[in-house]
């Protein structure tokens, strides 16, 4: 663009003024070009041309207006740029503030969630404490009730013990009276014993045989007293029954009543006859157990023999004492030998007398006694003369045979018990120890108990069934020997207990009833696992989006390829811009852009 040049005038002043105006106008256009260049626009050039076809000519006013308009536009654009820059900065600040507020809101939300969790935990703890306090209160109430019950039971026991003490005191008093009565009876018994013995033997008892005879007298006296009491009791009963019968007969007004009473009397008389017959049988048995006349004769003969032996013993003692008194200093060797022999003979005689008394004791077995009777009868004539003890030899031999046969009996019983009751471990008999009858009785009693138990419990399995059960257990649980059965059973029981504890814990955690079956427990655990897997899948879908697995794999591969380069680029930017935060990269770049302008 070229401004319209004023027409040339003749005067020099006009030319100078025009030149100055031209220079001033060019300077203004230069200043405008500077402004345009500062704003990134191309400058305007003032061209001096003579050809006016391609030119547009403005006058001074229009050029001045143009300059003003350009200045205004440039100023307006600069102002708008400043405003835009301020808006960008304010927008960035607002974004930063929004991020801060969002982070604060997230923190507040997280804090609120934490507080809610804390509040829920506090509520649960409060509920637990309330439950514990209620349980403690219930336990205390139950304890109070139990203590009250115990107090009542103790009071009842105290009353019972008081009653028992009074009863014991009464029993003590009655026992004291009974003791007094028994003491009197014992004194009477001793008096009667001595009286009967003095009547029979015409002397005072002072030997062992005398004491045995006193015991025998006491036994028969007690039997006689018992029979007297029973007889008196039966006579009293018969008298009372006869009186009742007479009363019944007197009370029966009619013939029918008389017949009924007679029938009743016949029944009662039959029962009495039966009772009397049973008593008769008992008395006959008692009489059979009593010694016979022959036995009494034997006892008398033994008493006579013992008296003779006692007299001989007394004479020997007198002779020995007399010889000791006479020959205290003068003792020859033959006299010493005779005295020792006499003492040995005396001891032998005492031993044989004791053996004879044992053999003829009523407590001796019947077979032994019967076998020894013949020998005693054969030696009666000699006993009167020289008091021989030849009849003791066969008896002692028979006893030895019986004792030796006990070993065979023990062996046979042992084999029988091994067949019948093999689970009873009988202790081994020592060869040095003798076989006792108590051991044989113990074996027989054990076998009888087993037989009785088998008869009572017929449903009990036999030995073969039990053996089959044990072998099946060994095969089932892989136990090679019987010694490993009990440890394996303990292991099975411990595993079973652990499984029961685990099932009980799962039932408590899943809030199931204790009576629920294992199928219900397994189904609930399966449902819970299914729900957990579904929640995990939903969380993965929320993170990765609703895409298929192949696209997720591609995204992960792209991320693995892109992330190292992006991380290196951001590290370089942080080093160049000398900042530490990623959020400060964009504001720093904008500042550099503004500074470059």
From Swiss-Prot:
Q: What is this protein called?
A: Centrosomal protein of 70 kDa
Gene Ontology molecular function terms on file: gamma-tubulin binding
Q: What does this protein do?
A: Plays a role in the organization of both preexisting and nascent microtubules in interphase cells. During mitosis, required for the organization and orientation of the mitotic spindle.
**Which InterPro entries does the UniProt entry name for this protein?**
CEP70, TPR_rpt
Each TPR repeat occupies one of these ranges, namely: 483-516
Disulfide bonding pattern of the chain:
none
For the biological process aspect of GO, one term held by this record is: regulation of microtubule cytoskeleton organization
One GO cellular component, as annotated: cytoplasm
Annotated coiled-coil positions are 66-179, 254-326
Location(s) in or outside the cell: Cytoplasm, Cytoskeleton, Microtubule organizing center, Centrosome
| Subunit note | Directly interacts with tubulin-gamma; this interaction determines centrosomal localization.
| Gene this protein is translated from | CEP70
- The region called Disordered is annotated at 1-23
Domain note: The coiled-coil domains may be important for tubulin-gamma-binding and hence for centrosomal localization.
Query: Which keywords annotate this record?
Result: Coiled coil, Cytoplasm, Cytoskeleton, TPR repeat
